[in-house]
């Protein structure tokens, strides 16, 4: 069957489902088998949604799954309702990001009501990703990553940390340095005692120190001493050595020495966009009024 044929069949199923819903509302039907009609309508809406999906009509698929979700709720089938809202969200993601968020939020409300916080956390991440990539609303992405981390805490600390690190990275980009520092220090402290994760701790302390550095050079020095004391392995890391060189260059207001230290580090460990942005912000304070080539190379 071609896409047009699938769409036609889906439209027929939607019409049949609507008839079943209307029939369930009549007085006698309500007394005798009203729920059966609703169950049949649920099944038809779901079949229609899947036909629309095969025809790649994502909005129609999302709408059909939504109708099924509402009827499942009418039947007190919370789990089925949440599942249908998630299916609706996944379909809408391809056509209408805001509607996808609305459906996923509806699913989250049901899961939290059922005490299924880990599943709710997963869907908060999906919403955060839609805000990141489709709607480009970083403040809202941060809020959903924070909520996800909150739900994961205690049950899945690794997943909570991943969400918190997203929050920290965005907070620093938005110049909310204190918030970023607190998260990087917290995650660093959590991971440094874990044999499998402790290698990552140096990265988190490095990022926290850079955030301190942007705000105040003395803060960065004190933070560096604290991190070395907390996590002795940090002292021998390339990140710690770079920080010391940068602090020295900053103290001397030596832009060339600063750039040279960054280039040397970058030749072994490629700098990502976040690190490049933070290092440039620090470099501008060396250049005084922010003049210069605005480059690290």
From Swiss-Prot:
One of its GO terms (biological process) is protein-containing complex disassembly. It is found in: Membrane. Pfam families: SNAP. It is a peripheral membrane protein. The keyword Membrane applies. Disulfide bonds: none annotated. Keywords: ER-Golgi transport, Membrane, Protein transport, Transport. The keyword Membrane applies. GO terms for molecular function: SNARE binding; soluble NSF attachment protein activity; syntaxin binding. One of its GO terms (cellular component) is synaptobrevin 2-SNAP-25-syntaxin-1a complex. Interacts with PRKCABP, and disrupts the interaction between GRIA2 and PRKCABP, leading to the internalization of GRIA2. Belongs to the SNAP family. Required for vesicular transport between the endoplasmic reticulum and the Golgi apparatus. This is Beta-soluble NSF attachment protein.
